[in-house]
Amino acid sequence: MTTTPSGDQNHTFRRYEDDDHDVDAWDEVIFQAGWSHKCPTYINKTPPCQGSCPSGHDIRGWLQIVRQLEKPTGDMDWQRYAFNRATDANPFPSMMGRVCPAPCEDGCNRNQVEDFVGINAVEQFIGDYAIEHGFEFEKCETTSDKKIAIIGGGPAGLAAAFQLRKLGHACTIFDDHEELGGMMRYGIPSYRTPRDTLDGEIQRIINMGVDVKLKTRVGKDVPMDDVEKEFDAIIWALGAKSGRPLPVPGADAPNCLSGVAFLEAFNEKRLQIVAKKVVVVGGGDTSIDVVSVARRLGHITEVHEKDSTENVVLGFTAHDVASTVVREGSTVTLTSLFPIENMTAAEHEVEDALREGVSIKGSVMPLEVMLDSEGRATGLRCCECTLDGNRPVATEGTEFTIEADIIVSAIGQSGDLTGLESMDNGHGFINSDKFYQVPDKPGHFLAGDIVRPHLLTTAIGQAAIAVESVQAYLDDQELSKRPKVDVHHFDLLHKLSEWNLSPEEHEAGESR
């Protein structure tokens, strides 16, 4: 949300004087930060945008390149130079530019002046330009005799493979789907993550020399013991693909579904229509994706039982009946424990859902799933509530029922550890220490939602830390506490190498 400057603020701290708001060119709207002391050149401390990014993006660095304040050497164009800098920490600029909720923009100093720098838009431009012009990552020779297994081919697993190949390690990704991508492919609606662009960003990583074993589930198709024997280290990047059911009576009805399963069925093109009345419980980004998909799909009046929403989502059928009938709009309602303005979903996503015709009820808690004589859900009984911390407190006398043909729970998710029960911490996740190691299991490391469901950029950042821990483990080095001091390390040798320069030899004379 934009923070405006106070009325008595000296206008010399801003770009414009009062009543002078003309913009000469579009790039001034985005790239005016360097003209104010509010966004200085950070040397001793991390810029607030970078400090707010879980993946550790050098955001200030690639923005400077795009603004032509830092120029490449030789015949490299600035687009390639910006791409190299932007992908040093995050190999998915096009995807992140589209779907990341941009904590970097929340941390931007320009919020104290007029509005944040449009970081997401610039990152998407860099990523899209790279796809259009066929940019590849540098070829990496396998200089190590170590092999690392990565269990899961989502953003965390792919980011780990990217970092491992840069270090010269051989790595193999095991994934139980037909295609790589994880939540980027199966958890986010395809209209938000164009498949050709996603495929291009994934293929770039595979082309670095990553081995892939698809439709292979460790713990079922391949015993974990066999993986431990074949590989020198394992990174668990399983994701969190099991949705949590509603903790209310009746939630086990056949037409009560999870948001994760709903979106996966849509992204696999199995789900073509939805029921007439859809109720979604949540308040986060997943719930917004579910209600938006439901509104866009709509329903038809005559549906064979095999083509009902729950049968398609649960994988019992995949008939495409929608192409021969007329669609009608579905009534879609989203309930949240939080007031609408405090929902965890991105504000612009909530606004988009409202514009698409979704009804959102804030400060509402579910009490019971209403069932018919056959045990199917017919509605959700709710009441108004307040929050005591994160605990909802029902407001007496405010009960009401929302009619529903299907009810979707998008209140959280956990990992599917079937066949890996020894790794389960009892909550559907795997325990991790501060170095993203599995406690008491040497050679086992973690990254992504299997640690704790969070942002895609968080999973990418965790993967980089896990790879650092893998390297220390392979080198038999003791891991030291990661510094929390907000200091940006300027790697002079890396910069000289990037500019094709070498430190000159010199003799040290007397110094006083």
Question: How should these model regions be labeled?
Answer:
Residues 20-40, 58-95, 113-140, 266-267, ...:
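Ferredoxin-type iron-sulfur electron-transfer modules in oxidoreductases and energy-metabolism complexes
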Residues 26, 48-50, 57-74, 112-120, ...:
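Beta1-alpha1 glycine-rich phosphate/pyrophosphate-binding loop at the start
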Residues 2-12, 16-19, 31-35, 39-41, ...:
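Mid-to-C-terminal Rossmann-like scaffold of FAD/NAD(P)H-dependent oxidoreductases
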Residues 254-278, 284, 296, 369-373, ...:
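FAD-site-proximal beta/loop scaffold in flavoenzymes
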Residues 142-149, 199-249, 368-381, 406-408, ...:
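Feature captures the FAD/FMN-dependent oxidoreductase FAD-binding
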